[in-house]
Amino acid sequence: MVPIYTRGGDVLVGPVYVAGASDMPCLGCLEYQLTNFDSHAGLAVSRAAAGARIGASHGLDIREARDLLVDVVFRSGGDRSGGRAVVGTLSGECVGVGNLTISPLCRLGGHVATCVGVEGPRAAGGDADLLVPGLRGGRFASAQSRRDMIAMSCDSLFGPVVGPRRFESISPGVLSGSVVPPVKNAGWGRKRTSLDADFVGVLEALERMSSLPYHDDAVVRQIDGDERCLGPADLGGYHEDQYTHSSSRISADAPEEWVAGWGMDGARVWVPAEIGFYSYFPEYGIADMASVFDAERTPLRRYEESSSGSATGATYGEACTHALLEVVERHAFMSFWYSSVLLPRIPSEVLSGFAREVEQWISNRGHEVSLLLLSSPYPIISVACVSFNARGEYPAVILSAASGLGFDAVCETALWEMTNMVGGERTLSESEARARLISKWDVMEAEDHIAFWALPERAPFIRAKCRGSLLSEGEVEKLRGRRGAGSRLDALSALSYLISEFPSHDLGAPVFVDQTNVTIGALGVSCVKCIVPGALGVSFGFAHQRVAELRVLERLGRSDLLASTDDLLPHPFP
């Protein structure tokens, strides 16, 4: 429900968020609440529905409420594509306009206190215990708590999540998506029950909504020379031909902008803005929809970053933990990709019953599966799943990956991730892929990475990387026995435990950027982006693969990639 608040003769349209101990009215700052009605459900229907719901809930005349929305909101003269919120009067007079972003945050002067910001170091140690190997606390352990979270997050008209979108079951279990205008689907949930699939999909949608800074002040142009920051030597840089190629969407001349992250020691570490918030475009600031709708946008970014390392959690520490696991998963996969060392394969006979069921489902659709045990810091287990089309047809190869502390759960997740790609629709047909991807430089988006390696003639290259020896049953049992399911760790201990072996893998101490915005905070969850110095990154586009200056490539026997792009290939997208 969207309340109407009156302040003298002024009217505010928007939800209530909690700021500290008091309830503060604000405009919500979800762009689609007001400016995307027409793109979501049809303008006429949405206006009437909004008026009816507001009038019914606040005792206002329905016509009066509808006129307020039509005359004040939709005729305010604001630029819809950039997002506008309105302060008006019941007579329809517009007395103030404020920007909206999908962050979201309150952009009207009197309500900035509702913004959720990080004013100092965030300590994970105060969080509730996390269960190992799942590394989740108890807040959402019950089915009712998950139902309540879905109910709080979803509203068919005003969001923040419009609602779950159930997909026809194309594999064992249930697949749900979460609809967030203006995109068709912003979060995927794949679980064994509808409730759990909806819940995971909603959490992922909230995670994606946190990909922009929560207020302008979060981004700074200058930092003190004595302060810690991460640059190309920590994150990877580009070769000159990557900067200059026509397929590049980055620029060495882009402004250097920074956001604050926090190390395990509580110290502030500055991170490039496009790394800390992967949807951030410097030329548009926090007006994210403006960048989406501007087809002529200029490439003023220094990084073309994926969402790797972003996670939501019931607490800040829980979010940090799962963000870290995703970085390790992607780094382990990329290490496998760049290295020429063969990794051990996991035999089907040792898999759990559910994993074998999923594997059989994939096999029934004409694909052969190889599960590889990736090299990752103890105690984390990372697995890659490689699916080969038995007929040698397009898509000839599909890849996925997963990581965690439980061997069976990690294998199940890696296989499960594969099912949607094996059974779902192709983003690009084979003819479209061939016409679009003439050379490696033509790989520019996530679907290009996938399609490039799905072409049949490239299958032998990947098959050659999947010929390692099979793990023995004894080796698998050691992996299963690393930690008992009943063990408990507080979040700080869990993070310390997970990173204890990082130095031996040429990985630095993680840095955490708190992406929690006002909506996420009001729902009582946190969103975090984790950055690990030295980790191999997953990027969108061959020209944006950051390999220069990453010394981990020397350990992998790929010093040639530090010198030039001659032997560099587009990475698959796990």
Residues of each region from the PLM?
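E1/E1-like adenylate-forming module used to activate ubiquitin-like modifiers
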Residues: 1-68, 104-110
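A structural signal for alpha-helix termini and helix-coil/disorder junctions
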Residues: 32, 75-76, 330
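Oxidoreductase and adenylate-handling cofactor-binding alpha/beta cores
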Residues: 66-79
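Helix-biased "structured C-terminal domain" signature
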Residues: 81-574
